């Protein structure tokens, strides 16, 4: 049905449950995935878990976009993940930008509930770090090194893209 509307932009349905093998997807997930021009996915996992997810998703031969990834409390940091996305040529953005009413700098409620039930399961979880947001309410960065890294790698990606577009 969507293709009949002749969309002018690529279509995507997010692969957000962490199921990257088509044969393990539900029928509705497969339908969305099969009709997507771009693979978009969420992964708050570790660096190694993201490498494995990327390996599986690249096998489909489509552009990839990670739409949720930053989880500082769980060890998933800008310093680790943004260079990986840059090197793998994966677009990304994170959930939350400026700390505010939505409180995406806080861990999710289910994390707090899980901690209350089983603190040992969160032994490696650093509750002193912000979960998502990049900027404070003052609009200063949470960590200037993060935003500097993002700006530097985005500038490199833009330059690489410009070079590919300039070639005959």
Residues covered by each model-derived region:
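Substrate-binding clefts and catalytic carboxylate motifs of secreted carbohydrate-active enzymes
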Residues: 1-168
